[in-house]
Amino acid sequence: MALGNGYYCAVVCVVLACASVVLCAPAQLCAGAADDDPRAARFCQALNTFLELYAEAAGEQVPEYQALVRDYPQLLDTGMKRQDVVHSFLRFGRRR
């Protein structure tokens, strides 16, 4: 019976995790504040779109982000200084 309680606890944890993701969705920052100015409305729409995409990427639900993390793990390693020559040329320019 203890094994059944473990499964019950796991199911409850998964349901709570899914509910917290749904409830923590980013709020619309300027939903009705920019109705008079069309430029402000476009800016607010772009800002809200960016925040939604950022929230998805932060949750690692975007396939492109997962592919980048999988294919280029050295980009995530910030503990070491980069040693490749191309990086120094891009940073300082190539002397002739």
Swiss-Prot record:
Tissue: Expressed in corpora cardiaca (CC), corpora allata (CA), antennal lobe (AL) and gnathal ganglion (GNG) (at protein level). In its non-pyroglutamate form, expression in GNG detected in all animals, in AL, CC and in CA in most animals (at protein level). In its pyroglutamate form, expression in CC, CA and GNG detected in all animals, in AL in some animals (at protein level).
UniProt keyword list: Amidation, Cleavage on pair of basic residues, Neuropeptide, Pyrrolidone carboxylic acid, Secreted, Signal
Signal peptide residue numbers: 1-24
Chain residues in the propeptide: 25-80, 96
UniProt key word Nucleotide-binding: no
Single GO biological process annotation from the record: neuropeptide signaling pathway
Residues modified to Pyrrolidone carboxylic acid: 83
GO cellular component annotations of the record: extracellular region
Modified residues (Phenylalanine amide): 92
Subcellular localization(s) per the UniProt record: Secreted
Superkingdom of origin: Eukaryota
Family of this protein: Belongs to the myosuppressin family.
Protein function: Myoinhibiting neuropeptide.
Protein's name in the database: Myosuppressin
Organism, scientific name: Agrotis ipsilon (Black cutworm moth)
